[in-house]
Each structure stands twice: as structure tokens, then as C-alpha cells.
């Protein structure tokens, strides 16, 4: 005997792109039954169980349904912006010259430290809303522009508040090992002491961080210093991720794999050894085409090696004031295809299935399957490849967040 299924809402009248296993796996004329914010039944409409009852039925007029988008790498909370420096760079002023004038990341650190929480919140809301308009239902937000215990906690509190004020799930990452603050010039190990002994334990104790990140690069922190950060994160019970191999090959992504990091991000200079280690560890490669584009880089991430070694590839906006002031995940999907040669199917998996894995959420998010969170998007499109094809326009018809239409 078939048991009765009762749901709050039955959504039907569109093709459902489930993204199970990172593939389209489209259900023609599909239906999704949701209850208490979860998917309780999914399949073709003609296969609806006779025992299924719904409090409401919502019929779409064609189109496609995809999982909600996940932006798994952002720096949305910061003070000010660096549009003046953008103009300077276009006029031939080097990054080193800008930094010598007090610009670069240190200018953002100053603006972030000077801003109170309400001002940071106001600015972050302005940046987050365009992502939500495109169907983002889950977003990761990093700290990393405070670089003191007080300012890092301030950033993380603002990130948490964003998830309370807007209908979006926010995952927070403590990125205190992002840059060397000016007061620690030539004392990087001392600053790492502060990160490991004070900032990470405070963030964990306050419940403000879901993960810990670091920037492993010649202009930031060495693999040995990052290893200390990872040890502190693990002691605090937090998973790790890493900015790695963006500008040079330092072995950061292999280090991340050794620590079973959720993800290693950027990866333009990753090697086959890195890709093999990441594949073995299940570490996701998060590709950030916005930074690649704005910095006019010429070395692409080794996508073929990631495919060869079964490394899941996610895509994110890397929204930040310096190298990727990008507030469109749809544009990142197109850039990943045109610049990095991902297929449209891989790119869609990059903002759904694999983005969920990059945040440790693969059991609950990223695909449309029974038991998972009811976050999905209805698009006025006929094929999922159109999500990578169109530049601008074509916003969602409807975004469903936890089983309810997001207003």
C-alpha cells in the first residue's frame, strides 16, 4: 500500500533540472512537493502518487526549474570601495604605487575598521541584494578586512545579521589570515600567533564562524604559516579552506588537501600533483573568473587536470572591493565557460551541486532531491544552457527559499 504524502505546496508546470551528481538529469513536466521547507516528493507530474495531497498547488507556465544558486566564495562585508584605484590602474598607475600611497587592501582595512556595524551592514545589504535577484539562496561571506580581534568579530557579526534580515542562508568564514596588517609589518609570525591564539578561538566560541580560510601566497602567508592556521581551526572544530595558487605555485592547494579542506580557491597555478591530491581528498576547486578577468591574468586554472583527477569544480563571484567587484553570479557562469572552457552543465553544477560541497552542505543543498532543502528557481528559459549563454537580463520568474516564494 502506498502511504499518504501530505505537503504544504505542490509546484509543477515546468521542466526540473535536478543537477543530481552534477548533471542536468532533467525531469520533463516535473513536480516538486514541499513540506516544512524540505522536498518530500519529486518526479514527473504524470507520476504523482494518488495519495499525495497539498495545501496549495502552484502551476508554472513552462520554463525550467533549477536548484537555488550558491555563491560559495565572497567578501561582501567591507568598508568603502576602491573605484578610485580602479581608475588609477586604468591610467597606468601600478598596484605597488597605489599601495605605497596607502591604497590597496590596507585602504579597505582602514575603512572597515573605521565603520561601525550599522554602516557595514547597510553597505553589505546593497551588495547582497543583486545576488539574491539572480536566484542566490545561499551565500558564503568571509571576514578578513578587520585583522584585529574586534574588527574581525564585527565583520562576522554583520555577516550573520545579513542572514537574519534577508531570505538567504549565510555561511560565515573567518579569514583573519588574509593580509598582514600595517601594525605587524615584518612580523608575520607574530600576527599568525594572534590569529591562532585569539581570533580563531574567539570566532569559534562566539559561534560566528562556520569555517576558517587563509591566503597562501608570496604577498600574504607561507604554507608553514597557513599550516598553523589550519591546526588552530581544527583545534576549534572548524573546517578549513584556502586561497591558493592564484599568482604562483606555492603548494597551498596540496596543503589544503592534506588537511581535507572543503575547498581550495583560485588555483590558476595549480599543478597535476595539486589536482591529484585534491581529487584524493575530495577538496573542491573553486574557480573565480571575476578576479582572473579584472586582473587580466593569462594563466587559466588547469580545468583539464581537475577533470582528469575527478576534482569537483565550483564557481563563485569572489565579490570583493579590489580584484572582483562582481555582484552577478550569472556573469561568472558565462565567464567560467568562455574564459575557462567549462561546459554549461559544469558551470551550472559549479553554482549548485559543487558549490554546496565547497561549503560542506552537499547532504542538504545543491540538488533537487527528496529530503533536501526546498530552495529552487523558476526560469523563463527552455534549456539550462541558456543560463550560461545570456549576458544580462533573464532574471528568475520566481525564487523559492525553504519552500516559500521569496518576495
Curated annotation (Swiss-Prot):
GO cellular component terms, A-Z: cytoplasm
Presence of the UniProt keyword Zinc in the record: yes
Protein name stated in the entry: Imidazolonepropionase
Keyword field: Cytoplasm, Histidine metabolism, Hydrolase, Iron, Metal-binding, Zinc
Residues binding Fe(3+): 73, 75, 243, 318
GO terms of biological process kind: L-histidine catabolic process to glutamate and formamide; L-histidine catabolic process to glutamate and formate
UniProt cofactor(s): Zn(2+); Fe(3+)
The organism of origin for this protein: Serratia proteamaculans (strain 568)
Amino acid at each position: 500500500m502506498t502511504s499518504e504524502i501530505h505537503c504544504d505546496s505542490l509546484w509543477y508546470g515546468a521542466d526540473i533540472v535536478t543537477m543530481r551528481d552534477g548533471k542536468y538529469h532533467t525531469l520533463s513536466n516535473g513536480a516538486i512537493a514541499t513540506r516544512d521547507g524540505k522536498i518530500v516528493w519529486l518526479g514527473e507530474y504524470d507520476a504523482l502518487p494518488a495519495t499525495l495531497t497539498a495545501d496549495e498547488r502552484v502551476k508554472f507556465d513552462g520554463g525550467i526549474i533549477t536548484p537555488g544558486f550558491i555563491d560559495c566564495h565572497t567578501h561582501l562585508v567591507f568598508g568603502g570601495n576602491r573605484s578610485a584605484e580602479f581608475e588609477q590602474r586604468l591610467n597606468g598607475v601600478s598596484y605597488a604605487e597605489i599601495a605605497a600611497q596607502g591604497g590597496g587592501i590596507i585602504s579597505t582595512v582602514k575603512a572597515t575598521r573605521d565603520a561601525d556595524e550599522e554602516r557595514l551592514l547597510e553597505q553589505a545589504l546593497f551588495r547582497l541584494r543583486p545576488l539574491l535577484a539572480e536566484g542566490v539562496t545561499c551565500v558564503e561571506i568571509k571576514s578578513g578586512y578587520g585583522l584585529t580581534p574586534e574588527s574581525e568579530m564585527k565583520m562576522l557579526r554583520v555577516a550573520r545579521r545579513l542572514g537574519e534580515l534577508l531570505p538567504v542562508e549565510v555561511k560565515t568564514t573567518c579569514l583573519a589570515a588574509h593580509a598582514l596588517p600595517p601594525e605587524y609589518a615584518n612580523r608575520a609570525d607574530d600576527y599568525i600567533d594572534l590569529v591562532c591564539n585569539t581570533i580563531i578561538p574567539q570566532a569559534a566560541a562566539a559561534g560566528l564562524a562556520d569555517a576558517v580560510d587563509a591566503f597562501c601566497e608570496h604577498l600574504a602567508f607561507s604554507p608553514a604559516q597557513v599550516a598553523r592556521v589550519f591546526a588552530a581551526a581544527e583545534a576549534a572544530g572548524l573546517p578549513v579552506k584556502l586561497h591558493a595558487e592564484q599568482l604562483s605555485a606555492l603548494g597551498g592547494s596540496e596543503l589544503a588537501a592534506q588537511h581535507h579542506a572543503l575547498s581550495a580557491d583560485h588555483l590558476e597555478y595549480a599543478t597535476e600533483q595539486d589536482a591529484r591530491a585534491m581529487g584524493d581528498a575530495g577538496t573542491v576547486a573553486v574557480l573565480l573568473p571575476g578576479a582572473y578577468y579584472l586582473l587580466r591574468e593569462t594563466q587559466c586554472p588547469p580545468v583539464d587536470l581537475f577533470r582528469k583527477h575527478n576534482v569537483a569544480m565550483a564557481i563563485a563571484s569572489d565579490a570583493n572591493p579590489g580584484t572582483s567587484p562582481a555582484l552577478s553570479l550569472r556573469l561568472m557562469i558565462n565567464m567560467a565557460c568562455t574564459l575557462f572552457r567549462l561546459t554549461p552543465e559544469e558551470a551550472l553544477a559549479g553554482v549548485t551541486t559543487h558549490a554546496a560541497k565547497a561549503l560542506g552542505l552537499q547532504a542538504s543543498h545543491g540538488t533537487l532531491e527528496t529530503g533536501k532543502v526546498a530552495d529552487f528557481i523558476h526560469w523563463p528559459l527552455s534549456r539550462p544552457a541558456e543560463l550560461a549563454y545570456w549576458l544580462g537580463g533573464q532574471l528568475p520568474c520566481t525564487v523559492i527559499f525553504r519552500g516559500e516564494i521569496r518576495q
